[in-house]
Amino acid sequence: MKFFAIAALFAAAAVAQPLEDRSNGNGNVCPPGLFSNPQCCATQVLGLIGLDCKVPSQNVYDGTDFRNVCAKTGAQPLCCVAPVAGQALLCQTAVGA
């Protein structure tokens, strides 16, 4: 009986712990999931591929901030799937940008 009470106490404590913060410091500019990588890209081809992409130089907090940070380098704010070697496949315009 005591075992079940203690086990229930530990289970309740485990459930009450907050979830791990998995944010990347970039606010809600990109949707969670596939398109979760904020990138400042020089060019967007066919609305799908970002060329000469870089991670924003500072944390961004909303779409307007993301647009302004990317505009400093003449780039477009995009949310991409797989940024590799300065190229990003499957990009979409950032939320609110």
Curated annotation (Swiss-Prot):
Signal peptide range: 1-16
Keyword tags: Cell wall, Disulfide bond, Secreted, Signal
SUPFAM superfamilies (alphabetical): Hydrophobin II, HfbII (SSF101751)
Bridged cysteine pairs (disulfide): 30-79, 40-70, 41-53, 80-91
GO CC term, one of those recorded: extracellular region
Deletion consequences: Leads to wettable and fluffy colonies. Results in thinner hyphae and impairs the formation of aerial hyphae.
Subcellular location: Secreted, Cell wall; Secreted
Superkingdom: Eukaryota
Propeptide: 17-22
UniProt function note: Aerial growth, conidiation, and dispersal of filamentous fungi in the environment rely upon a capability of their secreting small amphipathic proteins called hydrophobins (HPBs) with low sequence identity. Class I can self-assemble into an outermost layer of rodlet bundles on aerial cell surfaces, conferring cellular hydrophobicity that supports fungal growth, development and dispersal; whereas Class II form highly ordered films at water-air interfaces through intermolecular interactions but contribute nothing to the rodlet structure.
Subunit comment: Homotetramer. Further self-assembles to form highly ordered films at water-air interfaces through intermolecular interactions.
Family, similarity comment: Belongs to the cerato-ulmin hydrophobin family.
Protein name: Class II hydrophobin 1
Gene, per the UniProt record: hfb1
